[in-house]
């Protein structure tokens, strides 16, 4: 970050990053909407009522950045949706640790943006294996603030290449910073999907 400031690139990079941030949040909202539309169709319930019932869980996740801390509120949201006690007590805690759709969206979008900003080569041939590997790795991601990006760090070399993908390097530091700035929204997407 010091190098960016000295070279005068700070504002140029920030002008790109806020656009990435906006696109990621829109993608989260689309993901949540699709999940609740499918859930509403399958359960024959109004998906917009289901989304409305999820607002306390969403806002709790925004404030805590933690899927684990949102479990009690999410259980109450599932109760309001009419989910039976046995199912909600099994699914909500399980999904708090393994359902990371918001984190996947964010990490993939941020990795793509960082590649484009640094003129690193990017193609479907690099992104698809990364997404598949990340999908498996996210199962081990802790439900704590920043847990998903820390889980993803060892796999970023798949997108950035061996030199740029060094977990101690500047590009990975930018990835961590970019991810942490929106971690609240990614967590909110994760926990909202748990109740869809």
Where are these regions (language model features)?
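Membrane-interfacial loop-to-helix junctions in multi-pass transporters
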Residues: 26-27, 41-50, 82-88, 120-129, ...
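Structural signal for alpha-helical transmembrane segments and their membrane-water exit/capping regions
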Residues: 1-7, 35-44, 159-162
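Entry/N-cap segments of selected transmembrane alpha helices
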Residues: 9-36
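Transmembrane alpha-helical segments and their short flanking loops
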Residues: 108-196
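Loop-to-transmembrane-helix entry motif
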Residues: 17-25, 54, 58, 94-101, ...
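Helix-loop-helix junctions within the multi-pass membrane cores of secondary transporters/permeases
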Residues: 57-138
């Amino acid at each position: 970050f010091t190098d960016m400031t000295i070279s005068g690139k700070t504002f140029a990079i920030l002008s790109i990053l806020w656009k990435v941030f906006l696109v990621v949040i829109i993608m989260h909202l689309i993901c949540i909407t699709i999940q609740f539309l499918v859930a509403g169709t399958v359960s024959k319930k109004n998906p917009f009522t289901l989304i409305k019932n999820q607002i306390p869980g969403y806002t709790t996740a925004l404030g805590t950045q933690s899927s684990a801390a949102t479990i009690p509120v999410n259980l109450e949201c599932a109760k309001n949706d009419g989910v039976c006690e046995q199912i909600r007590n099994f699914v909500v805690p399980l999904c708090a640790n393994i359902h990371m759709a918001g984190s996947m969206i964010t990490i993939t979008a941020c990795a793509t943006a960082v590649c484009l900003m640094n003129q690193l080569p990017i193609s479907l041939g690099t992104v698809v294996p990364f997404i598949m590997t990340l999908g498996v790795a996210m199962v081990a991601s802790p439900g704590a603030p920043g847990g998903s990006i820390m889980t993803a760090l060892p796999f970023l070399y798949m997108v950035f290449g061996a030199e740029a993908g060094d977990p101690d390097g500047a590009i990975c530091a930018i990835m961590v910073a970019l991810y942490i700035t929106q971690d609240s929204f990614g967590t909110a997407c994760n926990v909202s999907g748990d109740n869809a």
